[in-house]
A protein has these predicted regions:
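Glycine-rich, low-complexity intrinsically disordered segments
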Residues: 1-99, 103-135
């Protein structure tokens, strides 16, 4: 298999600055944040509107890529579980998936939330949430 190449399209600007500050999920008290899209890609935002539900895909540069099993939600009372059966950021390809709402649009910047990503997290893609799978 050939190596895949993914280039960031933007970055998250958040008041969360460490893994310890980040909630496990966006729905668990995460703040809103700015998603700054590279100016050269701003035209790709055409069609997005305030109130849209989108999925933001991020790359977790601080994640451990050699982790194969974790205690779900860091709870050692639970059994060790393969990372593909969890939402752990530590995994062979540390891609984050964040369902968020567009709160504001200013040129190449989207105010989105709630999102548990750390300030400086690279964004690799944005996709609309569709009413039904595969629509």
């Amino acid at each position: 298999m050939r190596g895949a190449q993914v280039r960031p399209i933007g970055v998250i600007r958040s008041r969360i600055i460490s893994r310890e500050q980040a909630p496990k999920q966006g729905s668990e008290g995460a703040p809103d944040a700015w998603l700054e899209v590279k100016p050269s890609l701003a035209a790709a935002l055409d069609g997005l509107a305030v109130g849209d539900e989108i999925i933001v895909l991020t790359w977790f540069p601080r994640a451990r890529r050699d982790t194969l099993k974790v205690y779900p939600r860091s709870d050692r009372r639970r059994p060790l579980t393969g990372v593909f059966a969890t939402r752990s950021p530590d995994r062979p390809n540390p891609v984050g998936l964040h369902p968020v709402t567009v709160r504001r649009i200013v040129r190449n910047r989207l105010r989105i939330g709630p999102i548990e990503a750390i300030d400086g997290t690279p964004v690799v893609d944005i996709k609309p949430q569709l009413p039904t799978p595969n629509s």
